[in-house]
């Protein structure tokens, strides 16, 4: 639940929460100015296609139930969201406005629904989907470009539109730079970015020794 403490950053009017397994491709500052009603969050849908057929995923996670199959995307009318899976979000990118009210709302839900919370497969995003079930503004896919979307929904994906890539499932830094099946292109983008930063760690305010200890030590295949 640590990442949900972003709702406690009361000194900020708005926060864009981003997971660490992502690669920024283009500026996303417009998310700080995007209209958002009080008490709402903004996030992209979860892809429920389960292309690797992971047996521990919910049984309803199938391509026919995936919200990304809906057109237009994102849906203009919430009446299109006819299945529970259509309202699931991926919490890789969440636009939120921190407040005591929102923090208490989340905390209260956890305390009042312990059995449901215990069944969550993806705790933080399942919780947010429940708490904000009618208060989510759906972001376009490119603000949280799940790498599997490129294969699961090729009609939706456009490389030029991607703002940030989300390396769900297998991580390029754990697999090494070798080709990775259908994800080779997206993984190579991460490795290119890594190589650029590794060559000039001073751009991050790091010495080469600091880079080796804090970053390179955790990357395989180099």
Task: Identify the role of each PLM range.
Residues 1-222:
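Glycosyltransferase catalytic domains, chiefly GT-A lineage
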């Amino acid at each position: 639940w640590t990442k949900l403490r972003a709702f406690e950053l009361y000194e900020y009017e708005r926060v864009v929460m981003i997971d660490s397994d992502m690669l920024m491709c283009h500026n996303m500052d417009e998310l700080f100015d995007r209209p958002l009603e009080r008490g709402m969050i903004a996030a992209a849908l979860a892809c429920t296609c389960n292309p690797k057929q992971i047996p521990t995923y919910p049984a309803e996670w199938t391509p026919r139930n995936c919200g990304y199959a809906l057109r237009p995307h994102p849906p203009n009318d919430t009446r299109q969201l006819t299945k529970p899976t259509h309202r699931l979000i991926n919490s890789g990118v969440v636009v939120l406005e921190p407040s005591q009210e929102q923090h208490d709302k989340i905390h209260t839900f956890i305390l009042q629904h312990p059995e449901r919370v215990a069944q969550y497969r993806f705790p933080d995003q399942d919780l947010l989907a429940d708490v904000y079930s009618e208060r989510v503004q759906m972001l376009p896919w490119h603000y949280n470009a799940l790498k599997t979307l490129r294969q699961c929904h090729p009609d939706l994906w456009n490389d030029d539109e991607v703002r940030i890539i989300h390396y769900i499932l297998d991580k390029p830094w754990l697999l090494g730079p070798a080709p990775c099946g259908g994800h080779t292109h997206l993984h190579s983008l991460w490795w290119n970015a890594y190589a650029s930063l590794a060559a000039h760690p001073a751009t991050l305010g790091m010495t080469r020794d600091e880079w080796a200890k804090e970053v390179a030590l955790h990357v395989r295949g180099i």
